[in-house]
Amino acid sequence: MASWTLTSHLLTLHRDQFARATQSRFLAHAASGKLSKPLISHWLANDRLYMQGYIRLTGSLLRTLQLPAKPTPSKAAGGIEVRLLDWLVDALVNIRREERFFMDVAERYGLDVDLTGEDGVSVRPERKIAGLRRFEELFGGLTTGRQGSSLLPWLEGAVLFWATEKVYFEAWSWAKGQAEGAAGKACEEDEDGGAMRREFIPNWTNGEFIRFVETLEGILNEGVQEVVGRDERLKKEVEDRAAAVWRDLLGAEEAFWPEV
């Protein structure tokens, strides 16, 4: 029997909602080139605003880390919180690269990803899709500076990062599988000119992305196991805290896909 891990436990919860969050009609339409440029533009613009919350959560999580006073050897991976620090630094680099990629594709395919009003600064609430508003609430609940648990103070933030990256990868991997069925259709014939099938889907399903997700998964599971051990009370506490984040995250992810 496989040993217990936190992430494998979370994946047994809310399976129907996980399926809805990773197999939406929006994804199916993206895979077959049936999304219009205005719809993709609005969704991408919201996804870009999601990135800003992601960046703020990274900063908040960095503040929870208790880094060791003792130096870490140059060729050593370091303890859990040092490894989490390294992952968060990589996450910041990746999210900035992703935003530049968004802008490059948008410019080449004629997609408008600017949601700001006449002032060029603010975004009216009605311009935000339901999923973005839910993510902003979720990120905000973890970045308000409130005192967290003394047991694994980084837990909720790490679970949220793993969960959002895991669901995103699984969603676009499912879309990639659907796209393979439309392989005979030229991307230039797609309603978006090929932006999804040629640019975005390959970018969101590559090997580097899944390795990035799996790295955090390993850090999260090992960090929890180090603290929990065989203590069933601590295990239950960690499961409950993580499950609450997982539930809210799935709701936000499901709501992030527009109706088509």
In which residue ranges do the predicted regions lie?
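A cross-kingdom marker for long, charged
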Residues: 224-227, 231-234, 240-260
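Active-site-proximal alpha-helical scaffolds that flank and shape metal-associated catalytic sites
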Residues: 74-212
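Helix-loop segments that flank and shape redox-cofactor active sites
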Residues: 25-38, 55-86, 150
